[in-house]
C-alpha cells in the first residue's frame, strides 16, 4: 500500500483491509471486486489486483505459506526486485537490501551520490552500498530504520539534520547542501483533459459501468468520455450513452469539478442522463447500483468526486 501512496492515506485503509482479509487464504478466496473495493481511494489499483493474484498463487503452489526465498518471491505476480527484497528483509529478516525512495535518498546523502531518483544506475549503486551495511542478523530492522529515517527525518525538502542519527557520517551534510542529493526527477509536463460524465437514475438506482482501459481497469464509474475540449468530451459521451440506452436529460451540465492524477489535470462536466424506454440493460460491464451499495463498491476517487459534485448541485 505504501508504494507511491502517502502514509496518511494508507493509515485509513490498512487495518480495515486486514480485518476484511486477515490472511493469504482469505485474500485468495475474495473476488477482484471485493479487493478493489477495499483498496478504493488508494489509487494504483494494479497493486490490488496483483496482490490478489499473488495470494492465489501462494495458496495454490505453496499451501498458503509465503515463500522465504527471494528467487521464489520474484516469481509471484506483481513482485519485482524491490517487493521480493522487502518481504524477504522486513518479514523474514534476511540479509537482502530493499531499496525504495526513502532508503535511496538517505544513502545517497550519506555517500553524496548524484543521480536521477529512481533511475536504474542510482538504484543499483545504492543497493550495492546497502548490502554492505546490513548485518548478518535482524537485517530487517536496519531496512525498516532506513525507511523510517527517510520518511520522518531525511525528507526530500528541509531534512532535519540536527536530529539525524547518521548526521556525523553524512557526506552531503558535510558539504552543506544535503537537500540537493541525489538530484531532481524530471517532472512530466501537465496534460489538460476534459471529461464529461453522466449520472443516470432509475427507480432509485444509479447506472455504473466497468472500466476496461489500463487506468482504473475493473473499477466501476459513471459513464464518461475524455477529449481535449469540453464540447468534444460531451459529444463523445453522447455516443457512449446510446448502447447503454441512455440520453441526456439536458445538454447543459449540472455541475463541474476538477481532479488531478499525476500530471493529468481533469476538468469534469457532470450531466444528467435518463433511460430510453424500459432500459432493461443486460450486459456484464454495466449495472444499476442502489445508493447503499455504492459505499462498498469498487469505485475510484474520481467517481466519488463526480457524485459529490452532483449532490452539491441539488
Language-model features, listed with the residues they occupy:
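Catalytic cores of DNA base-excision repair glycosylases
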Residues: 2-175, 179, 192, 242-247
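Intrinsically disordered, low-complexity, charged terminal extensions of DNA damage-control enzymes
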Residues: 151-314
Amino acid at each position: 500500500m505504501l508504494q507511491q501512496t502517502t502514509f496518511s492515506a494508507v493509515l485509513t485503509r490498512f487495518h480495515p483491509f486486514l480485518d476484511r482479509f486477515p490472511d493469504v487464504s482469505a485474500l485468495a478466496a475474495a473476488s477482484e471486486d471485493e479487493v478493489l473495493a477495499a483498496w478504493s481511494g488508494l489509487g494504483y489499483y494494479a497493486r490490488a489486483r496483483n496482490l490478489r493474484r499473488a495470494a492465489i498463487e501462494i495458496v495454490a503452489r505453496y499451501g498458503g505459506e509465503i515463500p522465504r526465498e527471494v528467487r521464489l518471491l520474484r516469481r509471484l505476480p506483481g513482485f519485482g526486485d524491490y517487493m521480493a527484497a522487502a518481504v524477504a528483509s522486513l518479514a523474514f529478516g534476511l540479509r537482502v537490501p530493499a531499496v525504495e525512495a526513502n532508503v535511496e535518498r538517505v544513502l545517497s546523502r550519506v555517500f553524496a551520490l548524484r543521480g536521477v531518483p529512481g533511475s536504474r544506475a542510482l538504484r543499483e549503486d545504492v543497493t550495492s552500498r546497502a548490502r554492505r551495511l546490513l548485518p548478518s542478523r535482524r537485517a530487517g530492522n536496519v531496512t525498516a530504520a532506513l525507511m523510517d529515517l527517510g520518511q520522518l527525518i531525511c525528507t526530500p525538502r528541509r531534512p532535519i539534520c540536527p536530529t539525524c542519527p547518521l548526521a556525523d557520517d553524512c557526506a552531503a551534510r558535510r558539504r552543506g547542501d544535503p537537500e540537493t542529493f541525489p538530484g531532481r526527477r524530471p517532472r512530466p509536463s501537465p496534460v489538460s483533459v476534459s471529461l464529461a460524465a453522466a449520472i443516470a437514475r432509475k427507480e432509485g438506482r444509479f447506472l455504473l459501468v466497468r472500466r476496461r482501459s489500463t487506468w482504473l481497469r475493473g473499477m466501476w464509474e459513471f459513464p464518461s468520455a475524455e477529449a481535449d475540449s469540453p464540447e468534444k468530451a460531451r459529444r463523445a459521451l453522447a455516443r457512449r450513452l446510446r448502447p447503454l440506452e441512455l440520453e441526456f436529460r439536458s445538454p447543459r451540465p449540472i455541475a463541474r469539478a476538477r481532479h488531478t492524477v499525476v500530471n493529468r489535470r481533469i476538468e469534469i462536466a457532470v450531466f444528467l442522463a435518463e433511460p430510453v424506454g424500459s432500459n432493461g440493460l443486460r450486459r456484464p460491464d454495466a449495472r444499476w447500483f442502489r445508493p447503499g451499495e455504492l459505499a462498498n463498491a469498487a469505485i475510484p476517487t474520481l467517481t466519488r468526486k463526480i457524485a459529490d459534485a452532483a449532490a452539491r448541485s441539488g
